[in-house]
């Protein structure tokens, strides 16, 4: 069984260093490339670094290049990530991940290691009960909440009635505030009829500060002589999040394909399922977007997607696309904007490299395509042989070079016999700065080699 077990992490001051480890078992470590990926609080996954199985190639995300170093020790079956000059924005859960043998996705993950970069001191949370008024609980159910505010560092655990109450409980991810302290909230849905007869207690445990708080949550009786406290800020109770994705590079560069900008809304509640999309191109509203039927997710929320078809030349000319999302659970609409990276396009240079002599002792060999000097980073690389597509290839993400351009490698794995038979293999590159947006470089075994 494949296992990746991580260690390291913790709380560190800005500017200091930290090392993460990823110990592998259940497979031949020296034959696999393993990546580091991270997820900052409230954000999506971000690729960090990769080192090839033989240690010859290392690539880093722009945000960590020059500060982080990836390394491996095959004798210990361990991958490392040395992090120097750490910044608050490096705060995240870090994962090591291995790609599945036959597919370009991460199939095996470490358990995750939390790294917190902050100058804040350890601080226990303040806990506030969140309860409806007695007049607003007549709908059959009532939502009771618990706001856990201003603590450091992560994590904090929240339970209800000392763990006896688990049904209807939803604890939202922590939010890192501008103060450098964390806040989160937990909500439980209970029958309205149980209020007043059943006791509900929110149990909070913050081990770093050795703080334990038990807070009773009960509805407030409000009348003309009693003013209910204001509701907490909606963002602290969670709510929909919006993500805007650009079209695929290949779609923008081939006239036969249809480029699309995609707006994705997640964490839409059952109570407020209706989502409204408004789309704008360079500030002018357009009405040709298509909204797909909402999909229910494993965490009992909805995911809603709206897709806007764009004109090839509009995207390449740098027009700005804005998705505006409205939902009753949001205090105000959320707007996300996207466009092609600004700057003068630079034409990629393409070089093909045959297998090394040492590799010819193996049953399979690697053909390499180096693509360098291009800008922006939107690019597509494919392989073919004798007019037929080749699928057994992997391409690194574009890497920022010292001159402001990007480079990448694409590696095609083929049986040695196919190479020695003199078959011609071609690396095809699509980029906006190329003539007709396309170029191709071929390689084959030269006679006598």
Swiss-Prot record:
Origin superkingdom: Eukaryota
A Pfam short name: C1-set
GO cellular component, one term: immunoglobulin complex
Consequence the record notes for mutating residue 302 to R: Impaired ability to activate the classical complement pathway
Mutagenesis or variant effect for residue 302 to D/A: Enhanced ability to activate the classical complement pathway
Stated consequence of mutating residue 255 to A: Impaired ability to activate the classical complement pathway
Annotated compartments: Secreted; Cell membrane
Keyword Chaperone: no
Domain Ig-like as annotated: residue spans: 1-96, 125-218, 240-339, 348-444
Region (Constant (C) domain): 120-449
Intrachain disulfide bonds: 22-96, 146-202, 263-323, 369-427
Listed CDD domains: IgC1_CH1_IgEG, IgC1_CH3_IgAEM_CH2_IgG, IgC1_CH3_IgAGD_CH4_IgAEM, IgV_H
Ranges for region Variable (V) domain, involved in antigen recognition: 1-119
Residues the record marks as carrying a glycan: 73, 299
Residues found modified as Pyrrolidone carboxylic acid: 1
BP GO annotations: adaptive immune response
Gene3D superfamilies per record: Immunoglobulins
Keywords noted in UniProt: Adaptive immunity, Cell membrane, Disulfide bond, Glycoprotein, Immunity, Immunoglobulin, Immunoglobulin domain, Membrane, Pyrrolidone carboxylic acid, Repeat, Secreted
Effect ascribed to mutating residue 333 to A: Impaired ability to activate the classical complement pathway
Quaternary organization: Immunoglobulins are composed of two identical heavy chains and two identical light chains; disulfide-linked.
Function: Immunoglobulins, also known as antibodies, are membrane-bound or secreted glycoproteins produced by B lymphocytes. In the recognition phase of humoral immunity, the membrane-bound immunoglobulins serve as receptors which, upon binding of a specific antigen, trigger the clonal expansion and differentiation of B lymphocytes into immunoglobulins-secreting plasma cells. Secreted immunoglobulins mediate the effector phase of humoral immunity, which results in the elimination of bound antigens.
Protein name per its UniProtKB record: Immunoglobulin gamma-1 heavy chain
